Swiss-Prot record:
Keywords: Ribonucleoprotein, Ribosomal protein, RNA-binding, rRNA-binding. PROSITE patterns: RIBOSOMAL_L20 (PS00937). HAMAP family: Ribosomal_bL20. This is Large ribosomal subunit protein bL20. SUPFAM superfamilies: Ribosomal protein L20. It comes from Methylobacterium radiotolerans (strain ATCC 27329 / DSM 1819 / JCM 2831 / NBRC 15690 / NCIMB 10815 / 0-1).
Amino acid sequence: MARVKRGVTSHAKHKKVLKAAKGYYGRRKNTIRIAKQAVEKGMQYAYRDRKNKKRTFRALWIQRLNAAVREHGLTYSRFIDGLAKSGIVVDRKALSELAIHEPASFAAVVEKAKAALPQNTAKAA
């Protein structure tokens, strides 16, 4: 059996880790052991934040919708209720984009949602 020397493979692995650690501060960018830990931690953060990104963007769309809908005299929750009752199925991202780029079209959607809501006289908004 021939002897296998692993210098080339280990060098390639080290290069790969150091390339991923590029831009890190201190020994994290040039010491293999520390760089490997930093890169792995970075990957954990990236995995976690790919999930959080979805939550964050949904929250942003809801905030934008709430602000846009209040200009038309509704709250976000009443608006969503009105959309459901009127049978309009549009996601929050699309509604948010509509509110920003097509205010006239968004106003029409809000009016449809308002029309589907029962008129509540006991509560003066």
